[in-house]
Amino acid sequence: MKRLSFLDRYLTIWIFLAMALGIGLGFIFPSFVGGLNKLQVGTTSIPLAIGLVLMMYPPLAKVRYEEIGRVFKDIKVLILSLVQNWIIGPTLMFILAIIFLPDKPEYMIGLIMIGLARCIAMVIVWNDLSKGDTEYAAGLVAFNSIFQMLFFSVYAYIFVTVIPQWLGMEGAVVNITMAEVAKSVFIYLGVPFIAGMVTRYIFVKVKGKEWYEKVFIPKISPITLIALLFTIIVMFSLKGDVIVSLPLDVVRVAIPLLIYFVLMFFVSFFLGKKIGANYAVTTTLAFTAGSNNFELAIAVAVGVFGIHSGAAFAAVIGPLVEVPVMIALVKVALWFQRKYFGSHSM
């Protein structure tokens, strides 16, 4: 069985350490915070914007866009994946946000953003560890990357502004426009998306696919973690005013996230098995639906609502919960393989 890299395996610990470092910097060196506040254009923090774009670039440079045609070969599986990723996932997270955070509309938004952002990076890792279908996973990642580029802003507007109004949840309504979200999506997803596609096209053509995937990609992969931790340090250095309530708030946000990741995985796995997909495709569907693009959720939450917002804070909790849960679910998937698929699983 493949092993998770040292950096990825302890990602939750690195995030906690980054939070602590950010909080410490904010209290011990207030001049550090003052310096960060000066590096802004309007409401946009320049260091944070750079960190967020860099965080998104390696995952999008890894995407095998040429594999997207694979997802159209089995329409039944494609429809199931679309339903799981773009109907069940966002709706489930919306419901959980309402149930667990009715008095915290900004935290609700952070959760909703996580539910809307379909995974395009770590899902490849979980899929490999659980012996999923590598090429099909690559196709779904490519498909979801393009789908998010086109429709994320529409989804965000519907789930954050329109549906709460329909349900009469006036206290939870946050008025945003599709243009606001689209602007952040373009900056934090569009720019690295274009850069990733161009990078892949040029280097594969000049140096070859094997060099690109075995030499170039491993070299740029750590950028995502470094940029993520940098982003968290900056965010938490500016949040000294909420430190006292931080532990309780982390737990309140973490509980619905835990329920979401577990439910999405199990529901998606058994739906895949129900339609007759083999183990490799079934587990790929389950991890694609069950994991999320927390980098995009953080970026959009910061871009639209600001670095000090509850939405940005809630989005940061996403990877804290997701990583250890997904590591556990990899073991569950391999147990399901032995129990339900046997020797004919691949």
Swiss-Prot record:
Its main location: membrane. InterPro entries: Arsenical-R_Acr3 (IPR004706), BilAc:Na_symport/Acr3 (IPR002657), Na+/solute_symporter_sf (IPR038770). It is found in: Cell membrane. GO terms for biological process: antimonite transmembrane transport; arsenite transport; response to arsenic-containing substance. GO terms for molecular function: antimonite transmembrane transporter activity; antiporter activity; arsenite transmembrane transporter activity. Keywords: Arsenical resistance, Cell membrane, Membrane, Transmembrane, Transmembrane helix, Transport. It comes from the Bacteria. Pfam families: SBF. Signal peptide: none annotated. One of its GO terms (cellular component) is plasma membrane. It is a multi-pass membrane protein. The chain crosses the membrane at residues 13-33, 41-61, 82-102, 106-126, 140-160, 184-204, 216-236, 253-273, 285-307, 318-338. Seems to confer resistance to arsenite by allowing cells to extrude this compound. Could be part of an arsenite extrusion pump. Deletion of the arsB gene results in both an aresenite- and arsenate-sensitive phenotype in the absence of IPTG. Belongs to the arsenical resistance-3 (ACR3) (TC 2.A.59) family. This is Arsenite resistance protein ArsB. It comes from Bacillus subtilis (strain 168). The gene is arsB.
